[in-house]
C-alpha cells in the first residue's frame, strides 16, 4: 500500500507545544492508536503512513489544533486523558467541536493553580447539572470522576460563598463489614471508608488549608448514619457510594436538605455491597425521583472513564460478562 506524507501547519509554536503535551505524550498516543509517524518540523506537523491512516491522523491533528486554539483551561497542554478522549471521539467518527467548549470549562482551580473541569461529554453534562440543580444524582462506573467533580463543585461553592460549609458522607457498609464489629474507636473505624473523600479534598485544597477548615467544622466528613435527625442549611452535601445505602437511609438522607443547600448523590448501581435481596437506595431513587422538579439525574458510562486506559477495558470486559445480550 502506498505511503504518503501530509503537512499540517501549526498556527504558532506555543499552540504546537500545547498540542504535543508533556514529554510528547500526544504524539506518542496518536502513533500508538494509528499506524503513522508524526514529526514537528519548521512549524508544521508532518504525518506519514498509509494513505487512509495518514489522512485520518492529519485530520485529527488539525482538529486537536483547533481545540488547543479554542482556549484550553489555564493555557495548559493537552493531557493524556484529554487526547485519549478526543481520539475515541475521532475514531468513532464524531466531531471534536464540542470538545473546545468542554476543555475550556473550569469548575474550580486548585490551591496549586491547576484548573479542574470536565474531560468528556458526560462529565460536561454532569458539571452543568452540578451548577444548576439543587439535588443531583450521578450514576456510573469507577473512574468517571463522579466523586471528584462533586467535591470540586462543593469547594467552588464554598469559595464563591454560595454555601457556608461542606458535608461529605458515605454509608459504612462495604465488603460486608459493619462499624459495630470493627475494632478501634469511631475515628479509626470510619477513616478507611471515608479516605477517598479526604484524598479528593487534599488534592483540591492543600493539607494545611483543609485541616483548618476541618478544625472550624466548615468541612465535615461523617458516616451516613450520623445524618439522622439533622437539617442541613447553607451546606453543600455529598453522599458518595450511595449504592450501599438502603432505601430507608436514602430517604432519610434526601429529607435532610435545608434552605440554601445543595445535594449530590453519587454511586454505581452495579457495585452494591448490601445483603442479597436488599434493594439499593440509589436504585430505588433512580426509579422514583426522575421528573421531580429541581432534581437532575446524570448517567456516566465507560466512555467517561478518565483513569488509566486499562480501567476502561476492565469495565468493558465486566459489562460484556454481565450483559452479554447488549454485545
In which residue ranges do the predicted regions lie?
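Flexible hinge/switch segments at interdomain interfaces of large molecular machines
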Residues: 1-4, 101-105
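Conserved adenine-nucleotide phosphate-binding loops and their immediately adjacent elements
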Residues: 103-115
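Interdomain "pre-motor" coupling segment immediately N-terminal to P-loop NTPase/helicase cores
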Residues: 39-103
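Short amphipathic alpha-helix segments
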Residues: 15-32
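Compact, well-ordered interaction domains used in eukaryotic information-processing assemblies
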Residues: 28, 32-43
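Conserved helicase motor core of SF1/SF2 NTP-dependent helicases
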Residues: 44, 112-121, 132-239, 243-327
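Short glycine-/aliphatic-rich beta-strand segments at the starts of folded cytosolic domains
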Residues: 1-18
Amino acid at each position: 500500500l502506498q505511503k504518503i506524507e501530509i503537512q499540517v501547519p501549526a498556527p504558532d509554536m506555543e499552540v504546537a507545544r500545547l498540542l504535543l503535551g508533556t514529554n510528547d505524550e500526544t504524539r506518542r498516543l496518536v502513533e500508538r492508536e494509528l499506524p503513522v509517524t508524526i514529526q514537528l518540523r519548521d512549524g508544521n506537523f508532518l504525518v506519514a503512513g498509509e494513505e487512509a491512516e495518514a489522512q485520518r491522523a492529519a485530520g485529527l491533528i488539525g482538529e486537536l489544533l483547533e481545540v488547543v486554539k479554542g482556549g484550553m483551561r489555564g493555557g495548559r497542554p493537552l493531557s493524556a486523558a484529554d487526547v485519549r478522549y478526543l481520539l475515541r471521539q475521532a475514531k468513532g467518527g464524531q466531531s471534536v467541536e464540542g470538545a473546545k467548549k468542554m476543555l475550556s470549562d473550569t469548575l474550580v482551580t486548585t490551591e496549586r493553580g491547576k484548573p479542574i473541569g470536565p474531560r468528556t461529554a458526560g462529565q460536561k453534562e454532569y458539571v452543568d447539572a452540578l451548577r444548576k440543580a439543587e439535588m443531583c444524582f450521578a450514576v456510573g462506573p469507577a473512574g468517571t470522576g463522579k466523586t471528584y467533580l462533586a467535591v470540586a463543585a462543593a469547594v467552588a461553592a464554598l469559595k464563591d460563598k454560595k454555601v457556608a460549609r461542606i458535608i461529605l458522607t458515605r454509608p459504612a457498609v462495604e465488603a460486608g463489614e459493619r462499624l459495630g464489629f470493627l475494632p478501634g474507636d469511631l475515628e479509626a473505624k470510619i477513616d478507611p471508608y471515608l479516605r477517598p473523600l479526604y484524598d479528593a479534598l487534599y488534592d483540591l485544597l492543600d493539607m494545611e488549608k483543609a485541616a483548618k477548615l476541618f478544625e472550624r467544622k466548615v468541612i465535615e466528613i461523617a458516616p451516613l448514619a450520623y445524618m439522622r435527625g439533622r437539617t442541613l442549611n447553607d451546606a453543600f452535601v455529598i453522599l458518595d457510594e450511595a449504592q450501599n445505602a438502603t432505601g430507608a437511609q436514602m430517604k432519610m438522607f434526601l429529607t435532610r436538605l435545608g434552605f440554601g443547600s445543595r445535594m449530590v448523590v453519587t454511586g454505581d448501581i452495579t457495585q452494591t455491597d448490601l445483603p442479597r435481596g436488599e434493594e439499593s437506595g440509589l436504585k430505588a431513587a433512580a426509579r422514583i425521583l426522575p421528573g421531580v422538579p429541581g432534581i437532575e439525574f446524570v448517567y456516566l458510562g465507560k466512555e467517561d472513564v478518565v483513569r488509566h486506559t486499562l480501567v476502561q477495558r476492565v469495565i468493558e470486559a465486566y459489562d460484556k460478562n454481565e450483559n452479554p445480550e447488549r454485545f
